[in-house]
Amino acid sequence: QMIYQLRDGHIVLESPFNRYQYYDWYQSDYNSNLINANYLNYQLQEGQTGVYSYGRIQDILYVHLASFKGQKKPFIELAQIIEASNNTTSGIILDLRTNGGGSDVNAHLIAKEFINNFIRIRWIRYRNGPDHYAYSRWISNELTPKQHNYKRPVVIITDRSVFSAAEDFVLALRQLPNVFVVGQFTGGGSGNPMTRELPNGWIIKVPRWQVADPLTKELYEGIGLEPDVILMQRTLDTTLGIDRVLDFSINYINNLNDN
């Protein structure tokens, strides 16, 4: 009950006999079976370890980024897929629904595929004392662009299940002129927990920093990142075999290319 009061999935208490963590996350409206059947003609391909899947919708590359957890290898593979699609697609849809985070190194590895200038991606400050406002000075984090970046329209789909490193990914890309974010607010949890052993041998993990928007320096903890357009899947949409957020994303890219 003590852990649940904090409503933060980055806080974990581990004992030899149990693990205590906040699990009452927001439910995602992502439906992989619906998308695979009705949008990808059952041609959805899964990457290594299942952290991403992808396919073509018309001439748009669709990527579901399920997680940023694990080793770098699958994300290097995905980066190569994105780079190879630069001249063969009219746009990319990056679906982050269900992505609860993972490694910001992996998130930034993919983000680099889209930036063409040296950019600030976030401000961070670390907890450094017991007082309520005991934090370090703000530290700027930047990303260096790749030589060849994806230049066509990009739509990112978010909902309340998007947390942590996945929010880092959104923070980095949403400032780009060719990137549009649609869906719902993200979950609002930056985390970066540190691990400590208690005197009784139990292990506790607690968040140790705050992350702020790279442009406004606004905090989003407990609030989330607002999309450019708020759009939610309805029960009727699912019954009809429609993903209205994905439909919007497809039409958005097609309309840009028609103009």
Predicted regions, residues:
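Flexible, low-complexity junctional segments that flank or bridge functional domains
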Residues: 1-126, 131-139, 197, 203, ...
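C-terminal "post-core" interaction segments
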Residues: 100-259
